[in-house]
Regions:
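Active-site-proximal helices and loops of the catalytic beta/alpha 8
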Residues: 32-39, 181-182, 186-188, 200, ...
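Active-site-proximal beta-strand/loop segments in catalytic clefts of secreted hydrolases
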Residues: 60-63, 125-128, 195-199, 287-289, ...
Length: 577
C-alpha cells in the first residue's frame, strides 16, 4: 500500500464516530484525530483514555499486612470465632478462612513499596461491613476443597451487609477510608480502585440457627432494610418488605441473590458507591458482573456517570470466551471494560511451560476484529484470588510480566506474584495466605521483583506502551517482537518490543517496517541510529529478558504506516458501532 492510499484511508476514517469506549466517556476527541495531528501526521493510537496509563497492584486487604493490631478483633465471633481459622493440609500445608489482621494501615505503610515497583493504582478487596462470625451453614470447607462456605468468614470483604459502612477490621483511629485514599494519592501518587458488589450480599440460609448480620442489609443510618431470615430463597415472600431485596431463586452458594428488578436496590447501591467515590475512589472494579443482567448494570452505571462521567469501570466476568465477556463492553450493556480472562488463559499456558511457543499467545489479543468495544482498554492479568495462582518458575513470572507490561491492555498484578508466592495454589490451598511485612522486605531483593520493577517503569514512562496500537512482527518459539505506536497531536512515539523467554541470549535482526531516526533503549539508554544507509537493527536480548527501543518521532516507514492506518480504521469502526 502506498503512502497516498494510506492517507486516503485515514481520511475516510474521519466519518467514524470518535467515541472512545463507552465505559468511560472520558476524553473529548478532536474532530480530526483520525486524520492528521497538527496537519502533518496521521493519528495512531489504541485508546486515548487516560486510564490506559495506569497499572494496578491488586491485594486482598486482610492478607497483605497487619499494620494495626488494635483493629484485629481476635475475640470476635463467640462460638463461631472469626479470627485465624486454619485449614490444615498434608505435609504442613495450610490455608486460612478467618481474619488475619491486614488493614488500611498495612497498605499505607507499604504504599511506597507499591509505588516503587512502578504501579500507579492499588485495588483492594471490598471495604464494606461484613458479618462478625464464621458462617455455620452450607457445606463445611476443608483444605483444598472448592465451592464450600461453611466455616468461612467475610475476611475477603465480599459478604457485605452494610455497603455504607467500612468493616471494623480495616480502619484505624487515625486512618479512615477517606484518609487512606487521600494519602495514597497525595504522598504516593497512587489511585484507589474500589471493588463494588451488586449481585449478592452475605450467606443467608441453611444456618443451624440464624446468625447476626448474615442475610441482612443495613442502610446508611444503620437501619435494617432487608433480611433473608435464614429462609431458603424459594420460600421468601416478595410482598414482605424485608424479602423484596432478594430473588426467590438460588444464586451463588448460599449467598443472598439481589433482586435486579427492584428500583430500591438501584437507589441503595447508587448512594453507597457515590459515597465512596466522593471519599476518593478513582475507579471501580465490579465483582461477578456476569451474574446480573446487563440492564441492571446499565442503569447503575448511568446513574454513577451522571455524577462522575469520566470514571473508569471494569468488571469481572469469569469466562474464557472472548465473545461472552465482550458483551459487557458494549454501550447498550453498560459499556465497561473487563478483566481479560481469555488473556489470562493464554498467558499462563505460555509462561507456565518452558516448551511453549510464543505464537500461542496471540489468539486472545483481538486487536482489530471488533470482538471487544476496545481491546486496548481491557485489564490484563495472570493471577487473582479466585483461581489457582500461575504455576510457573521465577523465570516464567519474569517473562509473563515482560509481556503484560508491553502488550495491549492495562496490567494488573496480584499481591505476592512479585516473589512467586504460593505458586499454583487455589483459594483453599493457600492462594490467599498472609503475605506480611517480612516477605515484603525480602521481596525487595527478589529477582522477579527486580525485573518487574524495570519493565513496569518502562511502561509507566512510555505513552506507546500505554496507549499505542500494536503491530506484531515475529512470534515464534521463545521470542516475540512487535511495535506499539502512539501518534497524536504533538506526541509521537514508537516502541519496538523484543522479548526472549529462553534461558539463553537471543539475537534479533529487525528490518521489517523499521522507521528511520534515533532509537533509544528504554532501560539501558543505549542509542541506535537508523538511516537510509542502515535500515537494520541487530539486538541481543538476555535470557528471560525484554528490550524496549523508543523512537520519539512520527512514523516514516510506509509499510508500517499502511498497517497502522488499516488497523486504526478497523478499531474505530468497531468502536463506532
Amino acid at each position: 500500500m502506498n503512502l497516498s492510499r494510506a492517507l486516503t484511508l485515514t481520511s475516510v476514517s474521519t466519518i467514524l464516530s470518535l467515541a472512545i469506549f463507552g465505559c468511560t466517556t472520558s476524553v473529548d476527541q478532536p474532530s480530526n484525530s483520525f486524520v492528521m495531528s497538527n496537519q502533518q501526521s496521521p493519528a495512531f493510537y489504541g485508546t486515548l483514555n487516560p486510564y490506559a496509563s495506569e497499572s494496578v497492584y491488586f491485594l486482598l486487604t486482610d492478607r497483605f499486612v497487619d499494620g494495626d493490631k488494635t483493629n484485629n478483633h481476635e475475640d470476635q465471633g463467640g462460638k463461631h470465632p472469626s479470627f485465624d481459622v486454619p485449614l490444615n493440609g498434608p505435609d504442613g500445608q495450610q490455608a486460612n478462612v478467618g481474619y488475619l489482621g491486614g488493614d488500611f494501615k498495612g497498605v499505607l505503610n507499604n504504599a511506597e513499596y507499591i509505588k516503587n515497583m512502578g504501579f500507579t493504582s492499588v485495588w483492594l478487596t471490598p471495604i464494606y461491613d461484613n458479618p462478625d462470625q464464621a458462617f455455620n451453614g452450607g457445606e463445611k470447607v476443608a483444605f483444598g476443597e472448592y465451592y464450600k462456605d461453611g466455616g468461612k468468614t467475610g475476611y475477603h470483604g465480599y459478604w457485605s451487609n452494610n455497603f455504607y459502612q467500612v468493616d471494623e477490621h480495616l480502619p484505624s483511629k487515625d486512618l479512615s477510608f477517606a484518609d487512606l485514599t487521600k494519602q495514597l494519592k497525595e504522598k504516593y501518587q497512587l489511585n484507589f480502585v474500589l471493588d463494588i458488589v451488586g449481585n449478592h450480599g452475605s450467606p443467608s440460609y441453611s444456618m443451624a440457627e440464624d446468625q447476626p448480620k448474615f442475610g441482612e442489609i443495613y442502610d446508611q443510618d444503620g437501619q435494617l432494610i432487608a433480611d433473608h431470615q435464614n429462609i431458603h430463597p424459594e420460600k421468601l415472600d416478595p410482598k414482605n418488605p424485608l424479602h423484596a431485596f432478594y430473588n426467590t431463586h438460588t444464586g451463588l452458594a448460599q449467598l443472598s441473590d439481589i433482586n435486579e428488578n427492584n428500583e430500591a436496590v438501584l437507589d441503595y447501591f447508587e448512594g453507597a458507591y457515590l459515597k465512596w467515590i466522593a471519599q476518593g475512589a478513582h475507579s471501580l472494579r465490579v465483582d461477578t458482573i456476569k451474574e446480573m443482567p446487563h440492564h441492571f448494570w446499565k442503569k447503575l452505571f448511568d446513574r454513577i456517570r451522571q455524577h462522575h462521567p469520566e470514571i473508569f469501570i471494569f468488571g469481572e466476568s469469569y469466562s474464557y470466551e472472548a465473545e461472552f465477556i465482550a458483551e459487557h463492553t458494549r454501550p447498550e450493556n453498560g459499556g465497561v471494560s473487563v478483566l481479560d480472562f481469555p488473556g489470562r488463559k493464554a498467558i499462563t499456558e505460555v509462561f507456565e511451560s518452558a516448551d511453549s511457543d510464543f505464537s500461542n499467545i496471540l489468539s486472545y489479543l483481538h486487536l482489530d476484529d471488533g470482538v471487544y468495544q476496545n481491546p486496548y482498554e481491557l485489564m490484563t492479568f495472570y493471577d487473582n484470588h479466585d483461581m489457582e495462582r500461575m504455576n510457573a518458575t521465577d523465570e516464567g513470572f519474569i517473562d509473563a510480566n515482560n509481556w503484560l507490561f508491553t502488550a495491549r491492555g492495562i496490567p494488573v498484578v496480584y499481591y505476592g506474584s512479585e516473589i512467586n508466592f504460593m505458586t499454583g495454589k487455589p483459594e483453599h490451598k493457600g492462594n490467599r495466605n498472609y503475605l506480611g511485612q517480612q516477605r515484603i522486605e525480602q521481596a525487595k531483593n527478589h529477582v522477579i521483583h527486580h525485573e518487574l520493577t524495570n519493565i513496569a517503569h518502562v511502561r509507566k514512562n512510555s505513552v506507546a506502551l500505554q496507549r499505542g496500537l500494536q503491530v506484531n512482527l515475529d512470534f515464534k518459539g521463545d521470542v516475540a517482537s512487535f511495535y506499539r505506536v502512539y501518534q497524536n497531536n504533538d506526541e509521537n512515539q514508537t516502541a519496538l518490543v523484543l522479548l526472549n523467554k529462553s534461558d539463553s541470549e537471543a539475537e534479533f535482526n529487525i528490518d521489517e517496517m523499521l522507521s528511520t531516526g534515533l532509537w533509544t533503549d528504554a532501560i539501558l539508554g543505549k542509542e541506535y541510529k537508523i538511516d537510509s544507509n542502515n535500515l537494520h537493527l541487530n539486538i541481543k536480548v538476555k535470557g528471560h529478558g525484554a528490550t524496549v527501543l523508543l523512537l520519539n518521532s512520527p512514523v516514516n516507514n510506509a509499510e508500517l504506516r499502511a498497517q497502522l492506518v488499516a488497523q486504526q480504521g478497523k478499531l474505530h469502526a468497531a468502536i463506532s458501532q
